[in-house]
Amino acid sequence: VIDIRNWLKECGSPEGEVEIIAKIESRAGVNNIDEILEASDGIMVARGDLGVEIPFEEVPNIQKTIIHKCRIQGKRSITATEMLESMIKNPRPTRAEISDVANAVYDGSSAIMLSGETAAGEHPVEAVKAMAKIAEQAEKNTQYINYIKPEDYHIKNLSEALSHSACTLAQDIGAKLIVACTRSGYTAKLVSRFRPMIDIIGMTTDERAYRKLALSWGVIPVMSEEFSSVDVLFHFGKCAAIATGLVKKGDKIVLTGGKPNGKSGNANLISVETI
């Protein structure tokens, strides 16, 4: 991972522009997960390969451990391979596959991924629809947020403290949405780390950041025009919240972000607005 980062730097790629997802598929990867996670932007748990490289009965615990570590570090986690394997040939998933997908959601995965089902399967569209339905239903479980809410995180800087405060404030006042106004996507990812019980809007002016945010847990990416002041920033944030259809007149929202001309990644503002 470090070699890839050095190569990207040599090629002139700005730091953070290209994110690296490390695929864990061997005992060596599992044994060195902390170091790999520190160097990466996220982890893919490749259960199919893991089940070949290590005893298959260990895979579920390894999956849960890796996802938990990702949540604590605020890194993305992707659970992948053989999730709806039977749908390569069949139009419906098995009951075991349905439970597998749901449990990956309960574990707190940032994303769940299909591979052979859509790459070479006979029912690719049905597989995507089935996985989406299972994930949406799993998230409706009233205990879902309790399963995945990290308790042992460590606040390292002002941006993390502000993002945590935004989540706590939103819960205390009964806000319907958190709007993270972000240029690079960093602020939205920090808010996502704390797994708030409400949706997060990641509002950005950067198309690359917009695409990346689709992989962050609970984040709805929204493109915005450039903003020249804090007032304009928060006005656009309210407009973005209304455009999603998730709020109505009288609802409260929490907005967080940084000064328009400030350094990327240095969120230092928080506000409560009423629609």
Predicted segments with their positions:
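Non-catalytic helical/linker scaffolds that mediate oligomerization, partner binding
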Residues: 1-275
